[in-house]
Amino acid sequence: MTENVPQGQITMPLQQGGAREISPQALAVADYLRSHKLLKQRPGILNGKRSDFFRVKRAIRALEDPKYKQLQSKPNSKLPPINSRNEAISIFRLMPINQMALRVDKLPTQTALMMKQKPEQGVPVLQVNPQQEFGDDMYYTWFYNPVPLTTYLYGALGVAAIFAGVLFPLWPIFLRQGVWYLSVGMLGLIGVFFGIALVRLVIFVLTWPTVKPGIWIFPNLFADVGFVDSFIPLWAWHGTPERDLLPQKFKNKKKKKNAGTVIESKEPPRKLTKEEKQKQKEANAQMEQMQAAFQTQLSSFATQMQQIKEMSDSGIDPQIIAAQLQAQYPPDKQAAIKLENEQAQAKLDERIRELAAQIQDKTNANKTGDKIEEVADKENKEAPKRIVTLEDANDE
């Protein structure tokens, strides 16, 4: 099976419809990938239910694994042959075509909460993407969930337990006593669980009006987690902040990332002196003058461009138009424009240095760097709008 599929992203719209017959090759590939260790599947929440998802590049690695060739070489194997990456991508396309695995997107926690989803710690909320693409870092989730062998074993054990319960009158006395003690112990555990739930509700009701938004003890008590994780953390405020839903490793990364940042002060802004207000007015006036000059030059260029367009539409030779443009910008005028731009840039740099010196004198050292960068960035962003270079004029 050879198909020239380019590497990277391949778009395929999601097909809507009812149940369809699954090809034997797709079923064999799904059985091979479903439990492969190279897939590194993780749990996610799709439509309120747990669903394993994985990256496309890991599925391609699993299909290129030598173990696949060994299984495919067996006489009764239904696995299609794979000899290149393009063929591996073509084989993986059988998953969305047969709707056994579809592309999904991981939703940000805030978006999931707005959609009334309930993300859990380390378990992101997933959403099916209508465009089924095959980029290396894209995610796919399984819609093919074969019944494992353990399910049949549990079913057989359930039938055996029911049969043994029917024969309870025939049990020996020591077995009957053991079952009675076990039943009492289980009822006691259930009672303790309901007692904890009642106590945490009472504590929340008492703390909600006094210490808003209220406190829950064992906030994960009813979450879909393990027994030990149900009691961790010990308490939490009502509501689930976005940071609390992140795994611990992401919290540590955030701490390291924000370790060197300076916390902004909550002090009220300092009032400007008369001298500073006067300098600010002068600076604003200079800015307005430069903007007016820029608008004048822009209008002039627009007029010239309109004239050039009219000349071009009338059939004038382009060489004549170029000669006229050259006449409008003789060498002495070009030198004057260049000198004017250099002077404007020098004034701009001088103004930035003055503002930096004022901030250095009037503020503490922790805030100086941020404010200088803010002023410099603002001035530099405005500079291209005020200075029209000769190259831009010639390009137009």
From Swiss-Prot:
InterPro entries: Sec62 (IPR004728), Sec62_asco (IPR011553). Residues 264-282, 368-389 have a biased composition (Basic and acidic residues). GO terms for cellular component: endoplasmic reticulum; endoplasmic reticulum membrane; membrane. Residues 252-288, 360-396 are annotated as: Disordered. It comes from the Eukaryota. It is a multi-pass membrane protein. Pfam families: Sec62. Residues 1-154, 200-396 are cytoplasmic. Required for preprotein translocation. Part of a complex that contains SEC61, SEC62, SEC63, SEC66 and SEC72. Belongs to the SEC62 family. This is Translocation protein SEC62. It comes from Yarrowia lipolytica (strain CLIB 122 / E 150) (Yeast). The lineage of its organism: Eukaryota, Fungi, Dikarya, Ascomycota, Saccharomycotina. The gene is SEC62.
